[in-house]
A protein has these predicted regions:
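Charge-rich, low-complexity amphipathic helices
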Residues: 66-67, 95, 105, 109
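A C-terminal, polar beta->alpha supersecondary segment
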Residues: 101-214
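N-terminal secretory/membrane-targeting helices
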Residues: 2-4, 94, 102
Length: 214
């Protein structure tokens, strides 16, 4: 791995160029990060993981709100070839991550929409359904009440008046906080599991940083 490769795939050559026309040697953490990603991609590919154009486009649309590689390259001051490779590698790593993790990471909860008047006591069916959607089987829709008093949502929302048809924005906010707490706990577990997997991959490699030249 050369310094040029690291610069091209991190900051981009144009952005890294100094006023005197030279380039600073990449920091060790950037070098390690670049090598780490390359090793993960290689491991994924050895397991037969590939990506399709549709998967790449979906990833770009989700993360960059465009499927035009040139726009992404321009925004990050990268060449189109480098931008395309980085995006492709990111999709490969995501697919590999999803395939090896035993912890399933759900979608992050979305915050409820605040009422136009800013009054947290504003009630609506929308807020009720928002809470019920998060609470899942903790809510008994047939009987229009909590299914039990053991769940996390009940413990935080029991003081609020909630029905199938009405709940306050304040209650919805509290439900969102419960959902985020649950999500963060799962995300932390998934992150730890992923870190362990990366360490396993890195443990198979020997990395030494020597003097580098462009």
């Amino acid at each position: 791995v050369t310094a040029r490769e690291v610069i091209e795939n991190t900051s981009g050559l144009d952005a890294a160029k100094q006023s005197d026309g030279t380039y600073a040697v990449p920091a060790a953490d950037k070098i390690i990060g670049y090598v780490r990603n390359a090793l993960v991609v290689a491991e994924a590919q050895s397991k037969g993981i590939t990506v399709t154009d549709d998967e790449v486009n979906n990833y770009m649309q989700t993360n960059f709100k465009t499927t035009d590689v040139s726009q992404v390259a321009s925004a990050y001051k990268l060449s189109e070839d480098v931008a395309k490779k980085l995006i492709n590698d990111a999709v490969i790593m995501k697919k590999y991550r999803d395939s090896v993790l035993t912890t399933t990471l759900p979608d992050a909860p979305q915050a409820p929409t605040a009422p136009e008047d800013g009054n947290s006591e504003t009630t609506s069916q929308e807020y009720a359904q928002y809470i019920i959607g998060l609470a899942g089987d903790e809510w008994d829709a047939k009987n229009n009440t909590w299914a039990s008093q053991d769940g996390d949502y009940y413990k935080q929302l029991s003081a609020y008046s909630i029905s199938n048809d009405s709940a306050s924005y304040a209650a919805a906010q509290t439900a969102y906080q419960v959902a985020m707490s649950k999500y963060s706990a799962v995300a932390s577990k998934a992150s730890q599991e992923w870190s362990q997997k990366i360490n396993e991959i890195l443990g198979k490699a020997s990395i030494a940083v020597y003097s580098l030249a462009l």
